[in-house]
Amino acid sequence: MPPRKAPAKRRSTDSGVERDRGALSQEKKDQRIALFLSDFDQQAKESIREMKKELDLLLQMAEKAFMVELLKMPTAIRKMKRKDLLNLQEGEEVALAAAATDCALEDVPSPKVTRTNSKKVKVTTIVEYEDAKYTSTKKIPKKVSKSKSLVSLSSGLNSKLHSLSRSVYSSTSVNEAVKTPASDCSATNFKAMPKVSKSAGLQQAVSRTVPTSERVQGMVLRSKSVPQDKMVPFVNIPLADGQTLCMAGGDLRNIDVQLLNQDTVQHIHNLVVSLNQQTCIPTHSSTLSCEINVPGADSSCVFLLRLRNTSD
C-alpha cells in the first residue's frame, strides 16, 4: 500500500485588510457615540437654561403679586411682627381680616375728573372795510380753543362780522356829518377832505368801542359846537359819558398835557410833523380841516382840528 501524502498547508486568505477595516469601523462608531453624547449634553444645557428663565419669571410674578397684596394691607398689619400675627386668636383674626378689607377699599382712590387747559389756536380772519374813496384791510386775531366745535367758531365769526358791518355804517354816517358843517368852505377845503377818508381805518377801530347811539349823539354835539367863525381853531373831544369837551381860540393853549394819555400826545406830535412836511399847501390864506382818531386818557375819542394857514 502506497504511503499517504502529508496534507498540504492551506494558504491563508487573510492578508491583513480585514483587520484594518474592522479597526476603522470601530473608530467611526466611537466618534459617532462621542458626537451623540456631546449633542445630548448641549441640548440638556439649553433645556436647563430655559427652565431657569421660566423659573425666574414665575418668581418675579410671585413677588409682584406679593407686593400688591402687601400694599392692599393696612400699615398696622404690615408693621406687625410675624409672631404677633401668628399668636392672634380666632376672633381677632376675623376682625383683622375685616379691617384689612375695609382699609383696602378705603385706600382705593376715587376717580376724579380733571379738566386740563386745551391748547389754543390763533385764528386770523381778514375783513375788508370799503369806503367811498379809500379801502383799508384790518386783521382781527381771535383765539379759539381746540375743544370748541366748528359751529361755535362759525357763530363767533358771524357775530364779529355783524358788529363790524354796523361800525362801518356808523363811521360812514359820522364822516357825512363831519362833511356837512364844512361844506361852506372854500375849494381848498374840498381838496383836503380826502385826508378824512384816509383816517377812516382808525375811525372804524374807534367806532367798535363806542355804542352807535353815543356816536350819533357825539356827532350831533360836535356839529353844533363848531364855531361859526371859520378862521378860529377849535377842538372837540367827546368823553366816555357822551358829553363833548369843546375848546376854541386861546383856550387851546391852556390844555393840560399831563392829563392826556401818552399815545394821545404822540399822535398829536405825528400830526404836526406830517402837516409841516406838506409841500402842496396853497399860497393864499385858507382853512385846512382834518380829522384824526386819538385814544384819550379814559376812552377812545375823536379830535377835530381846524388849522389856519396864512401866506406871508
Curated annotation (Swiss-Prot):
Keywords: Cell cycle, Cell division, Centromere, Chromosome, Mitosis, Nucleus. The keyword Secreted does not apply. Residues 1-10 have a biased composition (Basic residues). It comes from the Eukaryota. GO terms for biological process: cell division; mitotic sister chromatid segregation. Its main location: nucleus. Residues 11-26 have a biased composition (Basic and acidic residues). Component of the CPC complex. PANTHER family: AUSTRALIN, ISOFORM A-RELATED, BOREALIN-2-RELATED. This is Borealin-2. It comes from Gallus gallus.
